[in-house]
Every structure is written in C-alpha cells, then in structure tokens.
C-alpha cells in the first residue's frame, strides 16, 4: 500500500474529506475517513449520502465533491516519506523479494514521486494503480492483479497495509497480511479484518523484520 505506509499522507486525506463533506452538508469525521481509506471516492460519498439522505449522490454531486476534495488535498503540504519505510523496502530488496505498490490512487506523477523518495526500488510494470482495476479495496482485485503482474502465487507474497479495507483486500486475496497501524484507529479494527501480524509503526516493523 502507498498512503499511510510509504507516505504519511493520510492526515491530509482525512482533513480534506472532512472539510469538503462539511461544505456540501455531510458529516464525515476525520476518523471515519481513515475507515474508508482505499475505497473509490464515489463509494465513500455514497456511503455517507445513503446514511444521511437515504439515497446515493447524483453523478453531478459525486463529480463536484470529489473535485473539491482533490483541490483541498492539493493545497496541503506534500506528505513526507513515512519513517521506517525506506529501511523496510531496502530489506525487502536485499532478501531478493520483489517490491510492488498497490494503491487506489490514480496520480499520473506517482512513479516520479516514488522514484524520488525511494530511488531504485519500484518499477512501473510492477505497480497497481486506479487505472489497473475495476474494483477498489476491500475487493481483492488490486492484490490479485499484483500477483498476476509479478507471476506469483498468494503464498509467495506479503501484503503491508495500514487501512482496514486494505487488510480485508489482502486477506481476501489469500495473502499473508501485515498491518502497520500508522493512523488513529484502534488496533482491534485491523485485527478484526483478519491481519496476520500487527505493528504500531513502520520503524517497529523494520526492527522486527527477521520475525
């Protein structure tokens, strides 16, 4: 996963969702935004719309809200590299494993940003983004697509996730899934989604890599 694992970008996403939904007359707390991490924008908007109005948002509403959310997010300072992430990726490479990014993001500058922060780690053909899949997390499709791209079986891979929906997707794909709780949610939320291991941070995961 990228947001919340490689980059400390989730506070910006949560704040942007909270502000913009309020502007459009909806209630979405920052903590709830973390619960929806990994969903498509339309799915997040419709969950709140159904809860508060009893029906889905219109296509026009979804477009307007998501555009406003993107603009709000782009005003935020650039997210820093998550502490410990580079060290974990270096160990992954040293072990002869293949590092891949599986993200719901569709930013066109993604590879440039990854290469700038994690030089020599990722290859474009070994990335799964919003453009590669029809269904977002919690559907297992993004992780199944990653296995297909790398020519791997589920028992030959590891998933590293911070989001409940991402953990759910990894588990549903049949992959050993490690949760790293870099956000404000209780650990139990990640355990409940089926995480096989859980660490409180990327540095903690790095220190226990040999496990």
Language-model regions: role of each:
Residues 23-26, 53-60, 118-123, 151:
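Short helix-capping segments at alpha-helix termini
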Residues 14, 18, 41-46, 107, ...:
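An amphipathic alpha-helix signature
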Residues 22, 93, 171:
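Anion (oxyanion) recognition and catalysis
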Residues 86, 90, 106-211:
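Asp-based, Mg2+/Mn2+-dependent phosphohydrolase catalytic module
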Residues 74-101, 108:
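Short, acidic loop-to-helix structural element flanking the phosphoryl-transfer center
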Residues 2-32:
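Active-site neighborhood of HAD-like aspartate-dependent phosphohydrolases
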Residues 38-72, 83, 91:
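A metal-dependent, Asp-based hydrolase signature
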Residues 5, 103-105:
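Conserved phosphate-coupling serine/threonine residues in phosphotransfer and NTP-handling enzymes
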């Amino acid at each position: 996963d990228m947001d919340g694992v490689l980059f400390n970008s989730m506070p910006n996403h949560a704040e942007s969702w909270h502000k913009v939904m309020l502007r459009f007359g909806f209630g979405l707390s920052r903590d709830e935004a973390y619960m929806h991490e990994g969903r498509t924008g339309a799915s997040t908007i419709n969950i709140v719309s159904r809860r508060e109005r009893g029906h889905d948002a219109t296509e026009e509403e979804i477009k307007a809200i998501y555009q406003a959310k993107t603009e709000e997010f782009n005003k935020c300072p650039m997210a820093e590299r998550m502490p410990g992430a580079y060290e974990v990726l270096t160990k992954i490479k040293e072990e002869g494993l293949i590092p891949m990014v599986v993200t719901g993001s569709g930013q066109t500058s993604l590879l440039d940003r990854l290469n700038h922060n994690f030089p020599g780690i990722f290859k474009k053909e070994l990335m799964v983004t919003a453009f590669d899949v029809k269904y977002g997390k919690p559907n297992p499709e993004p992780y199944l697509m990653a296995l297909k791209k790398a020519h791997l079986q589920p028992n030959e891979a590891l998933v590293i996730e911070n989001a409940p929906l991402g953990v759910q997707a990894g588990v549903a794909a049949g992959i050993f899934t490690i949760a790293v709780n870099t956000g404000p949610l209780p650990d139990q939320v990640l355990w409940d989604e089926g995480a096989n291991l859980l660490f409180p941070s990327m540095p903690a995961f790095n220190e226990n890599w040999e496990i």
